[in-house]
């Protein structure tokens, strides 16, 4: 895409990363109807599970996810109790339909204690019929990680860790309230590989406050030096009327459309030069990774978590605000954690 075309197409429209968009959801699908949809799935239908854990110990100002800050662990305990009830209810409707993929997002799943990582993973395996090979991915915040948690995630069956970086520039990090050094990130990547996790994804953002073209390229070089199998490069969406905490970002420090385009292109050029293949709009993968292979062979799919190679028949969302996709339609849980 040329710079002129990118600027011409710079319109305020719903993001391509989520479809259907928020205004399309309505209250017309009842709990009973959702249960029928689950039971109507063919017995051989493959299932992908998404588990939402909407808590962080601090809010990143750029975040557009359904999450809330808590400095106490008791709300998380109460939430996990309610989540267990939902898991058992959905599991009763799904029966022995095979689960082929599981993703934990948030929020910060890495905020969970070692005990709750183990008990939640155990509950999922006891409730659902896991296939022989299940891809288990989790979003990890390096600020939450401890030596004990690496082993806990490995014991839970983690196969891919997704780590948010956004940008390594200290000025940008202060502006978005996400302090995370390169050395800290490298330690997490090395530690998670040491316990046997074979795949790592790193998320980057462009269009952030005080971010520059050179800074985006520098971050891409640092990310590539960590050798993640996958990299996601998303554009920051500034919607303070929807996410009030984004009002902490001074709009005057945000790059314009031209600068955003150049940041994206600069980071892309670095990643491609480092051997990554571009996958769709916003993903990159090393040539041997399943995502790159699927892109080359036409087997790539996309869901609410981004691109995937898992050919599941239904995506089941668990937890507050979680979205599911079934042959009969899309569903979303209520946002409230109460």
Predicted features along the sequence, with ranges:
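Short, compositionally biased low-complexity segments
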Residues: 6-10, 58, 236-240
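Flexible, acidic/Gly-rich N-terminal and inter-domain linker regions that tether
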Residues: 1-47
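C-terminal scaffold of the Radical SAM
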Residues: 39-46, 69-93, 97-338
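A short secondary-structure junction motif
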Residues: 21-24, 59, 69
């Amino acid at each position: 895409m040329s710079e002129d075309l990118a600027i011409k197409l710079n319109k305020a429209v719903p993001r391509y990363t989520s479809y259907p968009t928020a205004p399309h959801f309505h209250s017309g699908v009842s709990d009973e109807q959702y249960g029928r949809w689950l039971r109507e799935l063919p017995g051989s239908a493959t299932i992908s599970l998404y588990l939402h854990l909407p808590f962080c110990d601090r809010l990143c100002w750029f975040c557009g996810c359904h999450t809330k800050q808590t400095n106490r662990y008791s709300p998380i305990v109460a939430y996990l109790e309610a989540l267990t009830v939902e898991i058992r209810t959905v599991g009763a409707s799904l029966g022995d339909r095979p689960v082929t993929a599981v993703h934990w997002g948030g929020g910060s799943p890495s905020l969970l204690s070692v005990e709750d990582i183990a008990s939640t993973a155990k509950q999922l395996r006891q409730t659902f019929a896991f296939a022989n090979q299940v891809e288990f991915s989790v979003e990890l915040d390096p600020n939450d990680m401890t030596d004990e948690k690496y082993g806990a995630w490995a014991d839970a069956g983690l196969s891919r860790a997704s780590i948010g970086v956004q940008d390594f520039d200290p000025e940008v990090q202060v502006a978005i309230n996400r302090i995370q050094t390169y050395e800290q990130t490298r330690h997490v990547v090395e530690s998670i590989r040491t316990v046997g996790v074979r795949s790592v994804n790193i998320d980057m953002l462009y269009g952030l406050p005080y971010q520059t073209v050179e800074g985006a390229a520098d971050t891409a070089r640092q990310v590539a030096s960590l050798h993640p199998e996958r990299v996601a490069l998303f554009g920051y969406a500034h919607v303070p009327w929807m996410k009030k905490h984004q009002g902490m970002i001074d709009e005057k420090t945000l790059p314009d459309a031209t600068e955003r385009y150049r940041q994206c292109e600069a980071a892309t050029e670095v990643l491609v030069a480092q051997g990554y293949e571009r996958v769709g709009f916003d993903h990159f993968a090393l040539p041997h990774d399943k995502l790159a292979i699927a892109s080359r062979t036409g087997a790539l799919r996309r869901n609410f978590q981004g691109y995937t190679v898992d050919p599941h028949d239904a995506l089941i969302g668990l937890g507050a605000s979680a979205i599911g996709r079934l042959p009969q339609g899309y569903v979303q849980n209520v946002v409230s954690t109460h």
